[in-house]
C-alpha cells in the first residue's frame, strides 16, 4: 500500500470497500496525479518545476515500457491492462501542467474550475470509470471531482503567507458549492460510486472547520479526524 493511502488518509477511506485491484489502481492513479499537479501549485522556481516535470515525462515513458520507478506507477502497473492509454493521459497531464508554470490561479471561481477541468479531465474521467463502472453517472462524478480539487488547492494554499492565503469568503463559497453538490449526489449516486464523493465529503468538513477557525487563528487549523466521517455513510452506500 502506498504511504499516501495508508489508514488515516483520505484515499484510504475513499477506496476502502472496492475490490483490491480497483482500490490499488484508484489510489495509484490519484497519487500520481496529485504529485504532478502539485509541481505547479507549489511556489517553486520555474527551472526546478521544469526539471521535475521532465522527470515525470521520462517516468511516464518508463511506465509505458514496463520500467517505472515511482511507487504509484509501479503499483498501477500491476493492474493496468492498457498502459498506452494511461501513458497518453499522464503525458497530457504533464504537458498541461507545464503550460501553467508561473501562472497565478484565477480568483474567479468559475474560471478556476474551468482550468481544473482542462488540466485534470482525462485522468479524472479514467478514475470515474474505475470507481463508478461503465454505467455510472460520470458527469456527476466529475463535477464532484472538479469541486473537490478546488477545495484541495485552497486548503493547500492556507500554508502560504497570510497575504497570499485565500480570503474567508472564498473558502465559504467553495464549501457551500461542494456541500450542495454532495447533497444532490447523495440522492442519486449508485451503490459503490463513492470514491470522489468520499474525498469531497472529507474536504467539505475540513473546509467547514477551517472557516470557523480561520479568523481566530490562521496559523493553527483544527482538522477533522476523518476516521469519524466514513462511519456515518458506510452502511448507506455499501451495506
Label the predicted regions:
Residues 73-123:
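Hydrophobic alpha-helical segments and helix pairs
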Residues 104-114, 128-137, 186-187, 191:
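Short helix-to-loop capping/linker segments positioned immediately adjacent to catalytic or ligand/cofactor-binding
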Residues 151-157:
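Classical nucleotidyltransferase
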Residues 1-77, 93, 116-122, 138-147, ...:
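Catalytic cores of Mg2+-dependent Asp-rich isoprenoid enzymes
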Amino acid at each position: 500500500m502506498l504511504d499516501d493511502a495508508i489508514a488515516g488518509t483520505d484515499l484510504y477511506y475513499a477506496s476502502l470497500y472496492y475490490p483490491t485491484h480497483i482500490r490499488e489502481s484508484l489510489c495509484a492513479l490519484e497519487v500520481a496525479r496529485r504529485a504532478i499537479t502539485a509541481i505547479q501549485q507549489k511556489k517553486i522556481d520555474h527551472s526546478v518545476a521544469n526539471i521535475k516535470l521532465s522527470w515525470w515525462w521520462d517516468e511516464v515513458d518508463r511506465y509505458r515500457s514496463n520500467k517505472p520507478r515511482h511507487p504509484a506507477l509501479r503499483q498501477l502497473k500491476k493492474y493496468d491492462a492498457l498502459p498506452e492509454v494511461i501513458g497518453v493521459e499522464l503525458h497530457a497531464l504533464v504537458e498541461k501542467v507545464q503550460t501553467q508554470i508561473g501562472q497565478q490561479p484565477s480568483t474567479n471561481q468559475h474560471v478556476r474550475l474551468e482550468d481544473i477541468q482542462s488540466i485534470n479531465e482525462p485522468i479524472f474521467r479514467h478514475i470515474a470509470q474505475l470507481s463508478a463502472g461503465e454505467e455510472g453517472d460520470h458527469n456527476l462524478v466529475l463535477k464532484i471531482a472538479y469541486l473537490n480539487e478546488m477545495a484541495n488547492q485552497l486548503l493547500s494554499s492556507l500554508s502560504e503567507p497570510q497575504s497570499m492565503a485565500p480570503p474567508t469568503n472564498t473558502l465559504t463559497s467553495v464549501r457551500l458549492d461542494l456541500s450542495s453538490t454532495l447533497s444532490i449526489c447523495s440522492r442519486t449516486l449508485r451503490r459503490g460510486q463513492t470514491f470522489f464523493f468520499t474525498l469531497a465529503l472529507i474536504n467539505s468538513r475540513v473546509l467547514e472547520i477551517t472557516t470557523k477557525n480561520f479568523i481566530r487563528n490562521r496559523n493553527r487549523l483544527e482538522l477533522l479526524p476523518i476516521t469519524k466521517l466514513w462511519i456515518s455513510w458506510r452502511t448507506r452506500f455499501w451495506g
